[in-house]
């Protein structure tokens, strides 16, 4: 009789050999594009708030300072005219909002996922795990179930649905995908972030300027990545390796960013010192992540930072003495798409690997080997992912 297999032997066989690797990235936005220069006039007109002249001037200044050129939004003028309660500052409107996002969030996620799967080039039956993240609405079964059905994933795909996480969650999906890939040999994880502002859009209020900050910054977008360990380089092309991933709550930051799902939709509340809280703690986060690697020059690594707003990026740059070039991909995504909550950092990863190839860099990380990805959001929560780039071959740049 053969000896029984030990638990240790089973565990060894279950685990992957190498680190989790990003194998493909796809992004998608709604068709409706909104230019920031035109937005204050449109926003105050559609919300019937044109009599608030001083408030409109404040909002115009917010938009001017946002460093955003354009955003994409599912909400069109027609949809808002049909749903006037969504245009008030506080009016019962959750049903109307839910009716939109429950359909559109998985649909936008599908568009991004299809692009990632196409780039990956493998049959979707090889997808073993699905992680879906959104702060836009809630449903049962969730957006993960809807997406699995839309894509025709196998019925036994292992799903994880993350609702109501907020702007840090692009880092969260990578951290979770990393653990899934490294602890399940042969796993291929489809991780998707899909965000639609229909749940947060509301009219202006003179007594709640923090709500208007969100109206000036937020945009719609979805991004998807395929993550797996031990890539088969005959048919799979690695983009970035994930070396470590961690989450922390910043000290003395309670209430800095809050969101509450109510009859009136999702309301956001921001404290002014959010950029200060993040910049004050950024060096500790970098030190915790990179001291084990012997790295302390923050200009020697590539940067992917959630662009919560320009003030956060400005203060982080100043605090750690970053060259302007380090945040180029991050600022490009802020400019061209706005703050898409959890999806942003995946858009930035996509921009970075594409720009690195176009500019003739030796690696996917702007020619550098090591990099950091930061997510910032409610808590105040910070996600830190240490990345390692891969060499760009002549074929990969094509």
UniProtKB/Swiss-Prot annotation:
CoA binds at residues 58-65, 311. It comes from Oryza sativa subsp. indica (Rice). The lineage of its organism: Eukaryota, Viridiplantae, Streptophyta, Embryophyta, Tracheophyta. Pfam families: Chal_sti_synt_C, Chal_sti_synt_N. This is Chalcone synthase 1. Pathway: Secondary metabolite biosynthesis; flavonoid biosynthesis. PANTHER family: CHALCONE SYNTHASE (PTHR11877:SF14), HYDROXYMETHYLGLUTARYL-COA SYNTHASE (PTHR11877). The keyword Methyltransferase does not apply. It catalyses: (E)-4-coumaroyl-CoA + 3 malonyl-CoA + 3 H(+) = 2',4,4',6'-tetrahydroxychalcone + 3 CO2 + 4 CoA.
